[in-house]
Amino acid sequence: MFALKFASLFILAYLLGSFPAGVVVGKIFFYKDIRKYGSGNIGTTNTFRVLGPVAGIIVFLIDFFKGTLATLIPVIFNLGPHYLCLIFGLVAILGHAFPIFLKFKGGKAVATSAGFLLGYNVHFFLICAVIFIPILFITSMVSLTSLISVVLIFIASFFFHDIALSIISGLLVILIYWSHRSNIARIEKHQENMVPFGVVYWLKNKHTKSK
């Protein structure tokens, strides 16, 4: 009976992660398939660019909290040890990156990963936020910020003396870098999109205006 319950909830965590918020919001409220615009990604950043800030915030919140909810499934249903939260959270992240509803072509899983961290350890999540936000303000690029932050977060995980957390954080490094392959190529060519704030964005604008 426990095995059936575990398997059912495991699948639920994957399906939660697979829910394509960007595609659903785009099609229902804007009559657009977000995969055909901008970078073609279904996540928060492309939603902001293509559909605007309101849609972007909604998609971010859905992607974020589906990670949190999936991570808390073992707690909600009393499945056992706390480390199971890491496994269920990772399954949701993989669901976002490889959603069954979109033929396994999903997003970069940054927002869902953040939600997963909140669900597992609030203190660790706050440290991750302190790492991520200043780097974003400096680089003006969500992709570059994610690539830098995930490595620093992996290093920070060792200070929590939680081997399971460190292992999952290491897997996230691999997943985030893999899902950002096209972004890395654009960064190397100085062609990556920027958010409209931050040090690099302001310096670039200043340089452009001075020409």
UniProtKB/Swiss-Prot annotation:
<keyword id="KW-0443">Lipid metabolism</keyword>
<feature type="transmembrane region" description="Helical">
    <location>
        <begin position="124"/>
        <end position="144"/>
    </location>
</feature>
<comment type="function">
    <text>Catalyzes the transfer of an acyl group from acyl-phosphate (acyl-PO(4)) to glycerol-3-phosphate (G3P) to form lysophosphatidic acid (LPA). This enzyme utilizes acyl-phosphate as fatty acyl donor, but not acyl-CoA or acyl-ACP.</text>
</comment>
<comment type="pathway">
    <text>Lipid metabolism; phospholipid metabolism.</text>
</comment>
<dbReference type="GO" id="GO:0043772">
    <property type="term" value="F:acyl-phosphate glycerol-3-phosphate acyltransferase activity"/>
</dbReference>
<feature type="transmembrane region" description="Helical">
    <location>
        <begin position="82"/>
        <end position="102"/>
    </location>
</feature>
<keyword id="KW-0472">Membrane</keyword>
<keyword id="KW-1133">Transmembrane helix</keyword>
<keyword id="KW-1003">Cell membrane</keyword>
<dbReference type="GO" id="GO:0008654">
    <property type="term" value="P:phospholipid biosynthetic process"/>
</dbReference>
<protein>
    <recommendedName>
        <fullName>Glycerol-3-phosphate acyltransferase 2</fullName>
        <ecNumber>2.3.1.275</ecNumber>
    </recommendedName>
</protein>
<keyword id="KW-0808">Transferase</keyword>
<comment type="subunit">
    <text>Probably interacts with PlsX.</text>
</comment>
<keyword id="KW-0444">Lipid biosynthesis</keyword>
<dbReference type="InterPro" id="IPR003811">
    <property type="entry name" value="G3P_acylTferase_PlsY"/>
</dbReference>
<feature type="transmembrane region" description="Helical">
    <location>
        <begin position="6"/>
        <end position="26"/>
    </location>
</feature>
<dbReference type="GO" id="GO:0005886">
    <property type="term" value="C:plasma membrane"/>
</dbReference>
<keyword id="KW-1208">Phospholipid metabolism</keyword>
<keyword id="KW-0594">Phospholipid biosynthesis</keyword>
<dbReference type="Pfam" id="PF02660">
    <property type="entry name" value="G3P_acyltransf"/>
</dbReference>
<feature type="transmembrane region" description="Helical">
    <location>
        <begin position="148"/>
        <end position="168"/>
    </location>
</feature>
<feature type="transmembrane region" description="Helical">
    <location>
        <begin position="57"/>
        <end position="77"/>
    </location>
</feature>
<comment type="similarity">
    <text>Belongs to the PlsY family.</text>
</comment>
<keyword id="KW-0812">Transmembrane</keyword>
